[in-house]
């Protein structure tokens, strides 16, 4: 299983590194948020040759990163900010299902999506309010 980590401080300069910077999006109630977390996935052995033939070594920059950013942004744009803490497991399950639909024909299987930090970004520069955070912070 591979872990694609979305976190502050990730170096996006390596296009094929398994990770990304926090995803910035807007909730249904028009609040700007920053999202960190992990996507756990594996290469489907049965479809691995097709993955390498059609996409090659660049599957992170061509598939995992753009699809993950798009789906995370889309799913959280349909949720009100006040509902995020109570809907965390449902959001994670929705993301897992949607990513699996997109990845399955590419030979990638999503095992899980874990949201570790969701922060509401206030209008004041540099101000944020944590919606939920991983226990290690």
Locate predicted features:
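Elongated, amphipathic alpha-helices that form coiled-coils and helical stalk/scaffold elements used
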Residues: 8-137
């Amino acid at each position: 299983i591979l872990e694609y980590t979305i976190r502050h401080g990730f170096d996006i300069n390596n296009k094929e590194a398994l990770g990304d910077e926090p995803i910035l999006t807007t909730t249904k109630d028009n609040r700007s948020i920053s999202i960190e977390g992990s996507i756990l996935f594996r290469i489907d052995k049965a479809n691995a040759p097709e993955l390498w033939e059609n996409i090659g070594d660049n599957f992170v920059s061509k598939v995992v990163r753009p699809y993950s950013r798009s789906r995370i942004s889309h799913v959280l744009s349909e949720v009100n900010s006040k509902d995020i803490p109570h809907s965390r497991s449902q959001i994670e399950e929705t993301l897992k299902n949607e990513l699996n639909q997109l990845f399955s024909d590419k030979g990638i299987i999503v095992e899980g999506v874990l949201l570790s930090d969701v922060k509401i970004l206030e209008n004041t520069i540099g101000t944020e309010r944590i919606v939920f955070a991983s226990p290690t912070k």
